[in-house]
A protein has these predicted regions:
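Short glycine/serine/threonine-enriched helix-capping/active-site loop
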Residues: 35, 86, 177-179
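Cysteine-nucleophile active-site neighborhood
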Residues: 54-120
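Generic recognition of short, well-ordered alpha-helical segments
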Residues: 16-19, 46, 65, 88, ...
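Flexible, glycine-rich phosphate/dinucleotide-binding loops
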Residues: 13, 41, 60, 92, ...
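Pocket-forming structural segment of enzyme catalytic cores
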Residues: 97-170, 174-187
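N-terminal beta1-alpha1 cap of cysteine-dependent amidohydrolase-like domains
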Residues: 1-78, 193-204
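Catalytic metal-binding/acid-base residues of hydrolase active sites
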Residues: 36, 58, 89-91, 141, ...
Length: 204
């Protein structure tokens, strides 16, 4: 049976994201494991076919051991397995690959339109997205484009209406979004996770 690890960054706080993400995995007939990373629980290496790193209330510059460990683990997982990161998880993924992560002038909490880039329109996860697709954001930090084109081939897939990065692909296996695709909204945002899981679990 294919397997999905959900790396939960909510620190035990009530949320609807983990249940929604688990439902996506189960819909794809995957064995789902949920790991409280803030509490120090992590997936066993090479045990899972793909990973989703959730959002959460923490800060991407937190000096706590869990933040350091998650940020270091993401590129290790992505060396061989697909990883999708959301919200805070996306900020940690971006930082792990050397992209600037900054606190914006105002927090973003609500539904906002995004703008896909040409790379986004051709990316297998984002190709359903249109200009002004509504997405849910709940954040006080943002990811900025790197000052120079990354040699790794990393690309911005979409920009938020605030002008920072809404989604990016850092490597073949490492991709994520500042918005929450697990939130059910009108538009194509929820297809991002469905496409990620179909691609990650196909043939496993």
């Amino acid at each position: 049976m294919p397997s999905l690890a959900i790396v939960d960054l909510h620190g035990g706080r009530p949320n609807t994201a983990v249940a929604a993400l688990s439902a996506y995995g189960e819909a794809n007939r995957a064995e789902v494991g949920v790991f409280d990373a803030v509490g120090g629980t992590f997936p066993r290496p090479r045990r899972f076919d793909c990973y989703i790193v959730t959002g959460g209330p923490g800060m991407p510059d937190d000096s706590a051991p869990w933040r350091v460990r998650v940020q270091a683990a993401i590129p290790e997982w992505a060396k061989s397995k697909p990883v999708f990161a959301i919200g805070l998880g996306f900020q940690l993924m971006a930082a792990a690959y050397g992209w600037p992560v900054r606190a914006p002038q105002v927090s973003r909490d609500g539904v906002f339109p995004l703008t896909p880039t040409p790379a986004g329109w051709t990316d297998p996860l984002m190709k359903d997205m249109e200009n002004a697709t509504p997405v849910l954001e709940a954040r006080t930090w943002g990811v900025l484009s790197p000052p120079a084109a990354p040699r790794s081939g990393a690309v911005v897939l979409a920009y938020s209406s605030a002008g920072d990065v809404a989604a990016a692909r850092f490597t073949k296996h490492a991709v994520g979004s500042i918005f929450h695709p697990e939130a059910r909204l009108e538009g194509a945002a929820s297809t991002v996770l469905a496409r990620f899981l179909m691609g990650a679990l196909e043939g496993t």
